[in-house]
Regions:
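A conserved beta-strand-to-alpha-helix junction within the catalytic ATP-binding
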Residues: 52-64, 123
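Conserved catalytic submotifs in the C-terminal HATPase_c
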Residues: 52, 72, 77-87
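Histidine phosphotransfer helical core of two-component systems
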Residues: 1-31
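Short conserved segment of the HATPase_c
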Residues: 139-151, 206
């Protein structure tokens, strides 16, 4: 907050553009560190899901809007293909936003030349599926199981807990996550969510 106040006052005064850029860099670094700390806290002290009716398509679009500047900066073409009819599940929307945020972030980091990200929703009577299809470097078959292990990462500066959090949240929601990938052919991350009525049945059965 103090850095942001200093930057605003500096801009208002019209003084020292070089110092202003340094302050902007400091603010971005503090925000990055805040994100890392938040991830670690979520990993070691997970919160209980606050279940409610949640439209996955609305949540996906909201998450993509939140990463719009990053997508533009990295020149990523992101497309949502809505194939699921009534993609409403019984879930914690804030936790699912974290899932989408982490998966999309991994896809962005994995892509370089002509980056394309497709987000596809589909469904059947029991489940709703969300697939993230990227045009990135891919993952070797022997490394795929390691993705969900704590602190495993191939990214420079990565902390290796993002997909572990994804796995835990999906498990807590009665769903699961799968990865299909190979080097040079991109990666497909598939999230499976039980439909609203099925999730409520599972909760009732767990109480009896």
């Amino acid at each position: 907050i103090h850095l942001q106040l200093m930057l605003r006052r500096l801009k208002e005064s019209g003084e020292d553009d070089k110092l202003g850029k340094s302050l902007e860099t400091c603010i971005k670094e503090v925000e990055r560190l805040d994100g890392i700390i938040a991830h670690f806290l979520e990993a070691i002290r997970p919160s209980e899901p606050d279940f409610r009716e949640t439209n996955l398509l609305d949540l996906l679009e909201e998450t993509l809007r939140g990463r719009e500047e990053e997508l533009k900066a990295r020149k990523v073409s992101a497309q949502v293909e809505a194939g699921a009819k009534d993609p409403v599940v019984f879930a914690d929307p804030e936790q699912l936003k974290q899932v989408f945020f982490n998966v999309i972030g991994n896809a962005i980091d994995a892509m370089d030349k002509d980056p394309k990200l497709r987000v596809i929703t589909s469904g059947d009577d029991e489940n709703v599926y969300v697939q993230f299809v990227d045009s990135g470097v891919g993952i070797a078959k022997e490394d795929v199981p390691k993705v969900f292990e704590p602190y495993y990462t191939t990214k420079k500066g990565g902390h290796g807990i993002g997909m572990m959090i994804v796995y835990r949240i999906m498990r807590d929601h009665g769903g699961d996550v799968g990865i299909d990938s190979k080097p040079g052919a991109g990666t497909i991350v598939t999230l499976r969510f039980p439909r609203k009525d099925r999730r409520m049945r599972l909760l009732e059965e767990a109480k009896t």
